[in-house]
Amino acid sequence: MTIFDNYEVWFVIGSQHLYGPETLRQVTQHAEHVVNALNTEAKLPCKLVLKPLGTTPDEITAICRDANYDDRCAGLVVWLHTFSPAKMWINGLTMLNKPLLQFHTQFNAALPWDSIDMDFMNLNQTAHGGREFSFIGARMRQQHAVVTGHWQDKQAHERIGSWMRQAVSKQDTRHLKVCRFGDNMREVAVTDGDKVAAQIKFGFSVNTWAVGDLVQVVNSISDGDVNALVDEYESCYTMTPATQIHGEKRQNVLEAARIELGMKRFLEQGGFHAFTTTFEDLHGLKQLPGLAVQRLMQQGYGFAGEGDWKTAALLRIMKVMSTGLQGGTSFMEDYTYHFEKGNDLVLGSHMLEVCPSIAAEEKPILDVQHLGIGGKDDPARLIFNTQTGPAIVASLIDLGDRYRLLVNCIDTVKTPHSLPKLPVANALWKAQPDLPTASEAWILAGGAHHTVFSHALNLNDMRQFAEMHDIEITVIDNDTRLPAFKDALRWNEVYYGFRR
């Protein structure tokens, strides 16, 4: 059972009565065949549901209205099998508030050269029916995705599946509640922002809860539940001597388990799926939540440190998008550099909170070590290196008049040396196109020091996310050149300025 089982995508066929009942019967027959095949063979993340043909303005309006009010409907896939006059779609598309994808396909793959006649031409009109539909989308300035390809083509399947992930994620985001335990880290700018504007733009709400309220729940957790969770730790992780039974830091592990259970209970009771903490606001907690946060992220919760609610929300969104895909997704921070001619590297980490979904090791190390910040007991944490391969880091920032999503494509590499004194999980990567260009572009665009790191998602996923939410995206990859990047920032300033 995944979040995608809670949603469905409606498959809508556009046509008209001009062609007569026999043509419409064939259109319906083709649509049923295509939907059944896609549900069976395309490995789509959620189910396609065929709706009745849209052949009149009233029918189309009813479909769009029903989609808006059906909580299970994540979006619409529209196929213009025949020509469908686009004025029929205006009222429905005007009210539609769900994501829309135009599937530019046709039932047959090859033309029947010897038998093709006007009946065939009238039945299979995607080539120009799709253009009529696309005009009204452009005329109405309505954002929608387009996938072209035969319905049996695997690349088309992948692109539809990727869009479905975005559509489901958008619906989940509309219900997302972010809990901030304490406030923003004092005097920090980029982690702050306009929470009202964020709720208007994305749909997620952000509210603060006193740490004392959390502490009350943590203290209510029974010793039996704590011991059961620690037994789970014993089976999942490599325990250091200090954390084992009779070890000098065993009590810290027990306390970390109590915090995890308390946090999870608090989040479940409040319906929260993302949260933040800050080391400056830990009153009543015996240690900074480290292990608890890591394990909650692995269960799908969004998180960011120092009150950074934008990154916490973005992590949850990307966790939903990547559900079931290979590779993990985590809170991350560009921490320090390795400058070496031709081999510049970035070491990413955080004080404690890196998600084990990106771990290279099957059983990360569970340890308790000193943390010289926060003024509390030594916290428990999982220590591991990260899987290698292509990845992205993404940052969502508030520019006042708009949101900007920054994405840097990176290549994670194996740590060339052991890190015996580094008591935290880490990731090591090469930034594309190179560290000087990537860091300068990131800084020029105002990118945050907190990011979401993902092996599971790619640049195309984040482009779709930005388009679906109608926000700016700036990309740093192997094609980036600083003069052109600076020009793009200037052009975006003008473009979004005109849209205010």
Swiss-Prot record:
Catalyzes the conversion of L-arabinose to L-ribulose. CDD domains: L-arabinose_isomerase. Pathway: Carbohydrate degradation; L-arabinose degradation via L-ribulose; D-xylulose 5-phosphate from L-arabinose (bacterial route): step 1/3. Homohexamer. It catalyses: beta-L-arabinopyranose = L-ribulose. InterPro entries: Ara_Isoase_C (IPR024664), AraA_central (IPR055390), AraA_N (IPR055389), AraA_N_sf (IPR038583), Fuc/Ara_isomerase_C (IPR004216), Fucose_isomerase_N/cen_sf (IPR009015), Lara_isomerase (IPR003762). Belongs to the arabinose isomerase family. Mn(2+) binds at residues 306, 333, 350, 450. This is L-arabinose isomerase. The gene is araA. The keyword rRNA processing does not apply. Its cofactor is Mn(2+). One of its GO terms (molecular function) is manganese ion binding. One of its GO terms (biological process) is L-arabinose catabolic process to xylulose 5-phosphate. It is an enzyme of class 5 (isomerase). One of its GO terms (cellular component) is cytosol. Keywords: Arabinose catabolism, Carbohydrate metabolism, Isomerase, Manganese, Metal-binding. Binds 1 Mn(2+) ion per subunit.
